[in-house]
């Protein structure tokens, strides 16, 4: 078996590659085909834990969801290279699911020759096991300053002779220039791989686009095969590396969940389910003023981070440490997830001297000691019966999620002052609650993606069951089936 490869390229980041790849995975899976997704290199702090007989570790969240859409088991070959930014000029390198210190230390232009054999082998294995491999590119294939070290776009397309779709975000303006310019910058041997142009995020009457699609086809000999309407609430997390900075609310606002948006925020995709809860406003916060209007019934969340110490320093520099403490002091709910849990403690200890020791926010009497080894695993655990309000709805609820962290967190060893207690509310040091109950920290990612937890926390606000991922994937497939020109999607396989 040698799979046919279909590749989604974009004129820019944020053009719509990730969700279109996901939709194609489900579309072809519904045709009874064995499908796998693939992205050679992903730069994202949104990662998921995978474990299969092909290996275990981390892959980009987008490829994880694409695998589920394809009705396949996520594995490390689907995203052989994951770059997790830790600073503006530095990323941790994850190769085949595992952190590679050697590649992390290597200048990025020097990596391509080292990693390409792994990328090619992973893709070839997936091709040998499937009928279709749907490949996602990165950024633009026409970054001519990077073409010599390309390992994610046209080098991949040439390797597997992929049928490529080039998608652009027409809502930004300049879509036809983006499409033509991208095509024009490619050499002829790569132009011939592009089988169609896709206009994404269009508002209005598609007939008004004429005669531009035909003019573009006259210039390039490539047809515009789909005009996809704007669709804000498709149900998938935002594309990797694209930060959805809009506050969202469904219906009249009854409660606000404010997520601190520090520079190296990670796993922000786990908050996607909150966007669909009636009466709940999800907002991303970068300044104390944005927290000033919150009531005690509103939540503040400190999410995951790929650079805990520097993001904690940033939080302090903005004055958000005092704002979070003030909200907690008023009895407002504060939730820390992973790095957020570590920040809520008394101290962060760095025995290796990488980032140095730092005081925490002091809202939980905990101490975190960073370690070189990373914990990467799926986890299922049950909340204690005695978990206090405002989190009491989670009492005895079993949740499934995942851990990706470096460090161990424990109660401080010195005697606590009166009333200063960290109560374990999940086993194994996974979650702690303060004496008042309003501050909760947990290592478990995916709380809001767990149906039982979501129902427990927001059941009164939900209008029926939350759509499952399967429903979301089928809606995506229905959407492209409706808006692609007849025969295009089957024709990509010929």
From Swiss-Prot:
Domain GATase cobBQ-type: 254-453
Record has GTP-binding as a keyword: no
The entry's keywords: Cobalamin biosynthesis, Glutamine amidotransferase
Protein name, entry field: Cobyric acid synthase
Family: Belongs to the CobB/CobQ family. CobQ subfamily.
Molecular-function annotations in GO: ABC-type vitamin B12 transporter activity; catalytic activity
Stored InterPro entries: Class_I_gatase-like, CobQ/CobB/MinD/ParA_Nub-bd_dom, CobQ_GATase1, CobQ_N, CobQ_synth, GATase_3, P-loop_NTPase
Pfam families in UniProt: CbiA, GATase_3
Biological pathway: Cofactor biosynthesis; adenosylcobalamin biosynthesis
Originating species: Albidiferax ferrireducens (strain ATCC BAA-621 / DSM 15236 / T118)
Active site: 338 (nucleophile), 445
Coiled coil: none
Function comment: Catalyzes amidations at positions B, D, E, and G on adenosylcobyrinic A,C-diamide. NH(2) groups are provided by glutamine, and one molecule of ATP is hydrogenolyzed for each amidation.
Entries under Gene3D superfamilies matching the protein: 3.40.50.880, P-loop containing nucleotide triphosphate hydrolases
PROSITE patterns tied to this protein: GATASE_COBBQ (PS51274)
GO terms for biological process, alphabetical: cobalamin biosynthetic process
């Amino acid at each position: 078996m040698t799979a046919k490869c279909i590749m989604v390229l974009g004129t820019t980041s944020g053009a719509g590659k990730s969700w279109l790849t996901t939709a194609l995975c489900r579309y072809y899976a519904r045709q009874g085909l064995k499908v796998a997704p693939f992205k050679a290199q992903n730069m994202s702090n949104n990662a998921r834990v995978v474990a299969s007989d092909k290996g275990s570790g981390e892959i980009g969240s987008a490829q994880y969801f694409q695998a589920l859409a394809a009705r396949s088991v996520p594995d490390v070959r689907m995203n052989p290279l994951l770059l997790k930014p830790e600073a503006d000029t530095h990323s941790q390198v994850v190769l085949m699911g595992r952190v590679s210190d050697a590649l992390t230390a290597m200048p990025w232009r020097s990596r391509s020759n080292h990693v390409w054999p792994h990328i090619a082998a992973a893709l070839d294995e997936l091709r040998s096991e499937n009928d279709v491999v749907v490949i996602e590119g990165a950024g633009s294939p026409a970054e001519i300053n990077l073409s010599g070290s390309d390992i994610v776009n046209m080098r991949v397309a040439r390797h597997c002779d992929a049928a490529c779709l080039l998608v652009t975000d027409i809502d930004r303006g300049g879509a036809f220039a983006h499409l033509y310019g991208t095509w024009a910058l490619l050499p002829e041997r790569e132009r011939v791989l592009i089988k169609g142009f896709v206009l994404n995020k269009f508002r209005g009457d598609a007939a008004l686009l004429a005669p531009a699609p035909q003019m573009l086809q006259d210039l390039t000999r490539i047809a515009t095969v789909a005009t996809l309407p704007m669709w804000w609430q498709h149900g998938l997390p935002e594309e990797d590396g694209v930060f959805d900075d809009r506050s969202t609310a469904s219906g009249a606002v009854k409660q606000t969940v404010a997520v601190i948006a520090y520079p190296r925020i990670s796993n922000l995709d786990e908050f996607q389910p909150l966007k669909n809860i009636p009466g709940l406003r999800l907002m991303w916060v970068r300044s104390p003023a944005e927290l000033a209007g919150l009531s005690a019934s509103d939540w503040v969340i400190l999410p995951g981070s790929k650079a805990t110490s520097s993001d904690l320093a940033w939080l302090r520099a903005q004055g958000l440490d005092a704002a979070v403490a003030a909200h907690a002091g008023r009895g407002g709910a504060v939730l820390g997830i992973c790095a957020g849990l570590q920040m809520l403690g008394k101290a962060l200890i760095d025995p290796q001297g990488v980032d140095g020791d730092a005081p925490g926010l002091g809202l939980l009497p905990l101490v975190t000691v960073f370690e070189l080894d990373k914990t990467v695993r799926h986890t299922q655990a049950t909340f204690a019966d005695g978990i206090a309000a405002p989190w009491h709805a989670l009492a005895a609820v079993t949740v499934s999620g995942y851990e990706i962290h470096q460090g161990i967190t424990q109660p401080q060893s010195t005697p606590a002052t009166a009333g200063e207690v960290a109560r374990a509310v999940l086993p194994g040091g996974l979650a702690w609650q303060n004496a008042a109950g309003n501050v909760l920290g947990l290592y478990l990612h995916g709380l809001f993606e767990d149906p039982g937890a979501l129902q427990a926390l927001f059941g009164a606000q939900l209008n029926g069951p939350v759509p499952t991922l399967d429903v979301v994937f089928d809606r995506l497939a229905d959407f492209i089936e409706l808006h692609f020109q007849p025969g295009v999607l089957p024709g990509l396989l010929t």
